[in-house]
Curated annotation (Swiss-Prot):
GO terms for biological process: mitochondrial electron transport, NADH to ubiquinone; mitochondrial respiratory chain complex I assembly. The keyword Cell division does not apply. It catalyses: a ubiquinone + NADH + 5 H(+)(in) = a ubiquinol + NAD(+) + 4 H(+)(out). Disulfide bonds: none annotated. It is found in: Mitochondrion inner membrane. Keywords: Electron transport, Membrane, Mitochondrion, Mitochondrion inner membrane, NAD, Respiratory chain, Translocase, Transmembrane, Transmembrane helix, Transport, Ubiquinone. This is NADH-ubiquinone oxidoreductase chain 2. It is an enzyme of class 7 (translocase).
Amino acid sequence: MKPPIFIIIMSTVISGTVIVMTSSHWMLTWIGFEMNMLAIIPILMKKFNPRAMEASTKYFLTQATASMLLMMGIIINLLHSGQWTVSNNLNPMASILMTTALAMKLGLAPFHFWVPEVTQGISLSSGMILLTWQKIAPLSILYQISPTINPHLLLPMAILSVLIGGWGGLNQTQLRKIMAYSSIAHMGWMAAILLYNPTMMFLNLIIYITMTLTTFMLFMLNSATTTLSLSQTWNKAPLITSLILTLMLSLGGLPPLSGFTPKWMIIQELTKNEMIILPTFLAITALLNLYFYMRLTYATALTMFPSTNNMKMKWQFESTKKTIFLPPLIIISTMMLPLTPMISILD
């Protein structure tokens, strides 16, 4: 893709998200979602091959269905209230339709089926955008309508997402699918806390985006897409490989890494709201995520997968440019736990 075209498309993607976040009119919000969806599809098809086309088609069909449900919810709310203003005073039926539509856009279970398939079919850079930037707009609308969301709809979605996010990643060898299932689980954690402390949901989102962004950037630097290719990068770039493994443990929520911070704070907040079963279930299902990350770390760090390639050193090295943002991102993604008392004001 030529740089001027890429800049125009990325500007449209960013503009769509900003319009969704800043508009107070439901029609403008819907237009922002459409701008964002139509602009991201050429980015997903950047590598023009059948798998990318299939992934883009799946993404388009899912997002178009979600947009249709969102518009239905907007129209029902308009008929009930007579206004287009984005507010937390929604008709119950409109709230259910909007929550379902935004759950489809986010990839919350049971609408999660498109996330692993689409992520696997596109390039690492496109997957990075899909699993980070594309989560901001739907979550910002959920944040705005959180007082009217039906907990009997959202909390089962949250529990199912955390469960499927851990279960689905157990037998995966493709790194992009592992990141996709991790994304589903993290969205479940955010949905669980949304009804009780929406601000903490945004804190969780920031930490998740930072960790996922850093992990994908290191994957691109290492050209790693499978567990086999990751295990073969020790001779090529041992420092980057060890950083990837540390980040994966952070994504799994292993203390004392940064990924433990949002889980700790969410469980604490749910307990303060006299929820016992939900945080217990979330903590137990989070072990599934941690298990497959630790298994991947063990397999990569302490064993070597069978390979037909007998070369220990890859003769061709990737370019090491564009790493200026990596050091601060790596520090934030792994060492933020000591700063937790500073952000406890959100409680």
